[in-house]
């Protein structure tokens, strides 16, 4: 993976270029328009010589007749080229932003779960929105400035040398001095830009935490805490912005001082008799006006460095994510529908970034069509076992088999298609009820199938009371639904999926007693002829399981039926006694 420090600005831009290249036609048109725009400005200045020497000098009064027409024509050309260049650059910029966001979005969807465990949602959102916008807007803005101001400088130099090479050659000493000034501030600009992007991620994260947890903030009186946190990161962002302004502001007067010294020397040199003999009023006016006109593009080119560095710093941040390794999907085996035999053999697993294994030497068989329940205290490793079946994480040692084959032999899509998951943390999308139930497969299922799944999940009662029934939009993460209603939508989703392997991770935890009793009947029906792994704190929901496995600190300590484990008077019996007070 590339390190930010290892990539120079040029290397970063070269890597970005393939993203821009498909839209180079727009860049070419914009470039031509910008050059014509700059040429019109330069030509406008050149008109001062005939105007002063001939027009007002009364040697050729016809100049005063055709000059206004030329000026009008140049202004029309300037307006047209300005519009064309702005439109084309915006078109290219929009395409680049869209392409970068698509690449980021697609790459992130292929990242392992461990990646999201380490990254805050706010930071990742900032990368997709703010940073990708910075790449395009900064780069396109810099391109406009470089082409237009660069063409202006070249045009002005050519005109100045044409009219008086003696005076113009003095300005050549400007080039290396300006180059040194730009190089000095470049590194500073890029470092500040990287800090600004990181701080923007912190601002987004802080705001997102408050917005998502606003109820908790209100209940626990966390307004002051959240305000202080947001103020802190906002002030940090302000300070980084001021550092950028400071660096940019220092470079401006330096360039202007260098240019003013050159202008002063030109005025002094113009007083030499050998130089004055070849100068007219028009010539000295054109040359001197051109030198003054050079100040603006030189200043713009100095500032463009900060703008370009901002874009390249954002680009490096995005490339860091794009260089991150995606989920390993090296399996070749594809299966339409598994029988459902699942087996853990001597499995040890440690979460990335941790030293202590979450699971140690797990041996577990879940025969096809049978129900195995995992029981244990919070943090014992029950949900971890379930997440390994879907290969959200890869194990350290041992192997996990499905139908006698290692899970790593299957393609991820084929493997995960065999599993339906209902967890305690239900995520619903800002879409209709029907589309949430048939998520990712809306075209595969009929309306009747969706309704049947909702009915079996005992969800139609509250769905029918909604304004638009199954077509009701339920808001972000089902904000318009109660916890129990959200859980039943998730169960309906699993019923409709009809996968041979079912994972119920606290599937009824958010339901009241009456709803739980009703939904349990549906779950019992759903579990028939399916391999089911049930994780539950409520022991009453797993008494009928074919086998109950007790997990303690990542190790299986007991296994057996409900009655067997009660008679054994071990950990399960203690948990049962705590819940039922026996």
Swiss-Prot record:
Catalysed transformations (reactions): ATP + H2O + lipid A-core oligosaccharideSide 1 = ADP + phosphate + lipid A-core oligosaccharideSide 2
CDD domains, per database record: ABC_6TM_MsbA_like, ABCC_MsbA
Notes concerning its domains: In MsbA the ATP-binding domain (NBD) and the transmembrane domain (TMD) are fused.
Keywords for this protein: ATP-binding, Cell inner membrane, Cell membrane, Lipid transport, Membrane, Nucleotide-binding, Translocase, Transmembrane, Transmembrane helix, Transport
Function: Involved in lipopolysaccharide (LPS) biosynthesis. Translocates lipid A-core from the inner to the outer leaflet of the inner membrane. Transmembrane domains (TMD) form a pore in the inner membrane and the ATP-binding domain (NBD) is responsible for energy generation.
Gene encoding the protein: msbA
Domain of life: Bacteria
Organism this protein belongs to: Shigella flexneri
Membrane topology: Multi-pass membrane protein
This protein's name: ATP-dependent lipid A-core flippase
Enzyme's top EC category: translocase
């Amino acid at each position: 993976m590339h390190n930010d420090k290892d990539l120079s600005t040029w290397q970063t831009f070269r890597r970005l270029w393939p993203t821009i290249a498909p839209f180079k036609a727009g860049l070419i048109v914009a470039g031509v328009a910008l050059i014509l725009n700059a040429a019109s400005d330069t030509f406008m200045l050149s008109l001062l010589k005939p105007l002063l020497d001939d027009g007002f000098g009364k040697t050729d009064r016809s100049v005063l007749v055709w000059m206004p027409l030329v000026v009008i024509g140049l202004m029309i050309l300037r307006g047209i080229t300005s519009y064309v260049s702005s439109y084309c650059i915006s078109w290219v910029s929009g395409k680049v932003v869209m392409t970068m966001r698509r690449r980021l979005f697609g790459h992130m969807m292929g990242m392992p779960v461990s990646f999201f465990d380490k990254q805050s949602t706010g930071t990742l959102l900032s990368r997709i929105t703010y940073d990708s916008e910075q790449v395009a807007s900064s780069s396109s803005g810099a391109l406009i400035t470089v082409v237009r101001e660069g063409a202006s400088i070249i045009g002005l130099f050519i005109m100045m040398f044409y009219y008086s090479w003696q005076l113009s050659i003095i300005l050549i000493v400007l080039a290396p001095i300006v180059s040194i000034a730009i190089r000095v501030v470049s590194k500073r600009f890029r470092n500040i830009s990287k800090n600004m992007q990181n701080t923007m991620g912190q601002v987004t994260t802080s705001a997102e935490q408050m917005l998502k947890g606003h109820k908790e903030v209100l209940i626990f009186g966390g307004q002051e805490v959240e305000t202080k946190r947001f103020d802190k990161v906002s002030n940090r962002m302000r300070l980084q912005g001021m550092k950028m302004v400071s660096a940019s502001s220092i470079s401006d007067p330096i360039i202007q001082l260098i240019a003013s010294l050159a202008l002063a020397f030109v005025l002094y040199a113009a007083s030499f008799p050998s130089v004055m003999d070849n100068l007219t009023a028009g010539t000295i006016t054109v040359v001197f006006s051109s030198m003054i006109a050079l100040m603006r593009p030189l200043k713009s080119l100095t500032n463009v460095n900060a703008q370009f560095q901002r874009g390249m710093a954002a680009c490096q941040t995005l490339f860091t994510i794009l260089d991150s390794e995606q989920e390993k999907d090296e399996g070749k085996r594809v299966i339409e529908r598994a029988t459902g035999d699942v087996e853990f053999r001597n499995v040890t697993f440690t979460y990335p970034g941790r030293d202590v294994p979450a699971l140690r030497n797990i041996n577990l068989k879940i025969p096809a069509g049978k129900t195995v329940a995992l029981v244990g205290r919070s943090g014992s490793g029950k949900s971890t076992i379930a997440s390994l079946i879907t290969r959200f994480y890869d194990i350290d040692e041992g192997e996990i088999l499905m139908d006698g084959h290692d899970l790593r032999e299957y393609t991820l899509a084929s493997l995960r298609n065999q599993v339906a998951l209902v967890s305690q943390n239900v995520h619903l999308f800002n879409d209709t009820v029907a589309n949430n139930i048939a998520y990712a497969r809306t075209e595969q299922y009929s309306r009747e199938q969706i309704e049947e799944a909702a009915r079996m999940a005992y969800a139609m009662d509250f769905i029918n009371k909604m304004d638009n029934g199954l077509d009701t939009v339920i808001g972000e993460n089902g904000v318009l639904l109660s916890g129990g209603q959200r859980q039943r939508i998730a169960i309906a989703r699993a019923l409709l999926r009809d996968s041979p392997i079912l994972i119920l991770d606290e599937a009824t935890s958010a339901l009241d007693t009456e709803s739980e009793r009703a939904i349990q009947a549906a779950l019992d029906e759903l579990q028939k002829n399916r391999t089911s792994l049930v994780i539950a704190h409520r022991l009453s929901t797993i008494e009928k399981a074919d086998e109950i496995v007790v997990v303690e600190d990542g190790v299986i300590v007991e296994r057996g039926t409900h009655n067997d484990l009660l008679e054994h008077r071990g950990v399960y019996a203690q948990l049962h006694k705590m819940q039922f007070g026996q």
